[in-house]
UniProtKB/Swiss-Prot annotation:
Keywords: Cytoplasm, Methyltransferase, RNA-binding, rRNA processing, S-adenosyl-L-methionine, Transferase. The active site is at C375 (nucleophile). It comes from the Bacteria. Specifically methylates the cytosine at position 967 (m5C967) of 16S rRNA. S-adenosyl-L-methionine binds at C254, A255, A256, P257, G258, G259, K260, D277, D303, D322. InterPro entries: MeTrfase_RsmB-F_NOP2_cat, MeTrfase_RsmB-F_NOP2_dom, NusB-like_sf, NusB_RsmB_TIM44, RCMT, rRNA_ssu_MeTfrase_B, rRNA_ssu_MeTfrase_B_ent, RsmB-like_ferredoxin. It holds the Pfam family NusB. It is found in: Cytoplasm. This is Ribosomal RNA small subunit methyltransferase B. Its EC number is 2.1.1.176. The gene is rsmB. Belongs to the class I-like SAM-binding methyltransferase superfamily. RsmB/NOP family.
Length: 429
């Protein structure tokens, strides 16, 4: 039996590592969840994700409730108070239980002398809640986004930025990809129905199903046998443009964690697929995905800027470049992105994308297809990137996705739809 741990202190320390040390929640959270009971895993995730989703609101409230911010070794207490405020604002946990557990968290982080302070701040919030929230709702902090990102969204989407921000602040729907080599989408939906769950097919992406209510993967019919994969609808859209065929040589560049690699093999089981990623650690997830789905691909560690180091002079019929990007289209899945990214990252990422595009283009056969994709909504990484590439690359031609003056297809995050995603389909003349 797992030792009873204080979830509030664990969540506070995880959020602190994201905000203060720049660590990714997807790296921090799984090892923490291994330390708690199954019934507590979901609550720990809810507290971490929720605090990061609403961080600017919680920060704003603490600044109003406390005369001085917590600094130095007491900084974790700042995040513990955030966890307390989040529970009072957004969960069904009874207030007395939320307060008691949060105050007890001070012992777990070895700050028992601050129990009174934590209790006092949270009770003060309860007394002033209505007045404080009225002021908060009139402030810029209400958008729950850093100011640099708000400015970029307002500039790029003067008519739509508010709906993008609103979608980013929602919990995401759970999209699945039915493995067409095992079942048709309709037959798998029937199995889902038999299991007491409801799903909805996507109108445009033939393998995509949205669950009415998110569910743990082990509850999904045939998950362990590779019948279905968790993948956002917009990510599945890459296959519409790539259109892989059997017997072709296909490169999936920046492939980890392998969702698109396995989708290529579901669409074209006899394709010769090479999956490459710079991050050796994340490549283990590509192997895991291939194993669960019973598929084979050549998996290599390599830098997209130097393809000759990992593929020599080899050329491919099709290349999927899911380029490293700001991930500003998937904030609802990864709310830590808002606080990990900086404005200065955007030109640096655009430069990296440009270098990879130029380096990999010679490895595409004449007449071949390259699909450039990002999970970003920022033009610098998307339409402007492809426009510049077309201008400097004489044998590149835009196909089916936009027009040369506004190249590519941009999906924006939507409440029941997929994430923010960009695609450009290029043909080598």
């Amino acid at each position: 039996m797992k030792k009873q741990r204080n979830l509030r202190s664990m969540a506070a320390q995880a959020v602190e590592q994201v905000v203060e040390q720049g660590q990714s929640l997807s790296n921090i959270l799984p090892p923490l969840q291994q330390k708690v009971s199954d019934k507590d895993k979901a609550l720990l995730q809810e507290l971490c994700f929720g605090v990061l989703r609403t961080l600017s609101q919680l920060d704003w409230l603490i600044n109003k409730l406390m005369a001085r911010p917590m600094t130095g070794k007491q900084r974790t207490v700042h995040y513990l108070i955030m966890v307390g405020l989040y529970q009072l604002l957004y969960t069904r946990i009874p207030p007395h239980a939320a307060l008691a557990e949060t105050v007890e968290g001070a012992i777990a982080i070895k700050r028992p002398q601050l129990k009174g302070l934590i209790n006092g701040v949270l009770r003060q919030f309860q007394r002033q809640q209505e007045e404080l929230l009225a002021k908060f709702n009139a402030s810029d902090a209400r958008y729950l986004h850093p100011s640099w990102l708000l400015k970029r969204l307002q500039k790029a989407y003067p008519e739509q930025w508010q709906s993008i921000v609103e979608a980013n602040n929602q919990r995401p729907p759970m999209w699945l990809r039915v493995n067409r080599t095992h079942h048709s989408r309709d037959s798998w939906l029937a199995l889902l129905d038999e299991a007491g769950m409801k799903g909805f097919p996507h109108a445009d992406y033939p393998d995509a199903v949205r669950l009415e209510t998110p569910a743990p993967v082990h509850a999904l019919p045939g998950f362990e046998d590779g019948w279905v994969t968790v993948q956002d609808a917009s990510a599945q859209g890459c296959m519409t443009w790539l259109a892989p065929q059997n017997s072709e040589h296909i490169l999936d560049l920046c492939a980890a964690p392998g969702g698109k690699t396995t989708h290529i093999l579901e669409v074209a089981p006899e394709a010769q697929v090479v999956a490459v990623d710079i991050d050796e650690q994340r490549l283990s997830r590509v192997y895991d995905n291939l194993k669960r789905l019973g598929m084979k691909a050549t998996v290599k560690q390599g830098d997209g800027r130097y393809p000759s180091q990992w593929c020599g002079e080899q050329q491919f019929d099709r290349i999927l470049l899911d380029a490293p990007c700001s991930a500003t289209g998937v904030i609802r899945h990864h709310p830590d992105i808002k606080w990990l990214r900086r404005d200065r990252d955007i030109p640096e990422l655009a430069q990296l994308q440009s270098e990879i595009l130029d380096a990999i283009w010679p490895h595409l056969k004449s007449g071949g297809t390259l699909v450039y994709a990002t999970c970003s909504v920022l033009p610098e990484e998307n339409s402007l990137q492809i426009k510049a590439f077309l201008q400097r690359t004489a044998d590149a031609e835009l196909c089916e996705t936009g027009a040369p003056e506004q190249p590519g297809k941009q999906n924006l995050p939507g409440a029941e739809e997929g994430d923010g995603f960009f695609y450009a389909k290029l043909i080598k003349k």
